[in-house]
Amino acid sequence: MDWTWSILFLVAAATGAHSQVQLVQSGAEVKKPGASVKVSCKASGYTFTSYGISWVRQAPGQGLEWMGWISAYNGNTNYAQKLQGRVTMTTDTSTSTAYMELRSLRSDDTAVYYCAR
């Protein structure tokens, strides 16, 4: 059977008292098992390197699952144990963008993926 599924990526936005903080993610993608996906999260409205970026996901009918965190200041990362070896988080400070790459995709990776400050 040819398994495919949708991996959805939404826009996360928050409003501060004096400026609008926005995290704008790349669009929905459809991937096959074994493939990889790289999601972008472009930040604006604040100093990118002053905060870390977390990645979470929500599978259908499930709660939020924390995937990991990256420091936008120095690139230090902390990944969920269950994703170790399959996930890589990076940042590009020149464009205030964070990236999350997930490899060797499986059916249970079907989820809505979010970045958050």
Swiss-Prot record:
Region (Framework-1): 20-44
Start and end residues of each Ig-like domain: 20-117
GO BP term, example: immunoglobulin mediated immune response
Residue ranges the record marks as coiled coil: none
Keyword Membrane: yes
Location of the protein in the cell: Secreted; Cell membrane
UniProt keyword annotations, A-Z: Adaptive immunity, Cell membrane, Disulfide bond, Immunity, Immunoglobulin, Immunoglobulin domain, Membrane, Secreted, Signal
Gene Ontology CC terms, in alphabetical order: extracellular region; immunoglobulin complex; plasma membrane
Disulfide bonds: 41-115
Subunit structure: Immunoglobulins are composed of two identical heavy chains and two identical light chains; disulfide-linked.
Family annotation (PANTHER family): IMMUNOGLOBULIN HEAVY CHAIN (PTHR23266)
Known role: V region of the variable domain of immunoglobulin heavy chains that participates in the antigen recognition. Immunoglobulins, also known as antibodies, are membrane-bound or secreted glycoproteins produced by B lymphocytes. In the recognition phase of humoral immunity, the membrane-bound immunoglobulins serve as receptors which, upon binding of a specific antigen, trigger the clonal expansion and differentiation of B lymphocytes into immunoglobulins-secreting plasma cells.
Name the UniProt record assigns to this protein: Immunoglobulin heavy variable 1-18
Native source organism of the sequence: Homo sapiens
Gene name of the record: IGHV1-18
